[in-house]
């Protein structure tokens, strides 16, 4: 099992931006790593505490039709001066990839 991660920031704490960024980041992770949905074991998503208008995993699940993949959401630990409005995704895969 391997893990792949990525991060993206959004312009505003609004559903539109959360949805667009989540789908974009997930799609980019799949594309850059030549992954198929079948390779995914589970997905972990964290957001900074200034994102509270929507669940990124909901939009990813709907857009990519992920019915049997576990998705968990977490709040990112707050650190003074850290990057605001940030969504991070960690995907666990059952495939060997060259990193």
Regions found by a protein language model. Give the residues of each.
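Terminal domain-initiation and capping elements
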Residues: 1-99
């Amino acid at each position: 099992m391997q893990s792949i991660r990525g991060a993206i920031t959004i312009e505003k704490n609004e559903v539109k931006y959360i949805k667009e960024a989540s789908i974009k980041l997930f799609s980019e992770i799949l594309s850059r790593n030549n992954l198929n949905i079948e390779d995914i074991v589970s997905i972990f998503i964290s957001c900074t505490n200034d994102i509270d208008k929507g669940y990124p995993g909901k939009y990813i699940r709907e857009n990519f039709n992920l019915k049997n993949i576990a998705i968990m959401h977490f709040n990112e630990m707050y650190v003074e001066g850290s990057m605001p409005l940030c969504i991070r995704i960690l995907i666990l895969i059952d495939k060997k990839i060259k990193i």
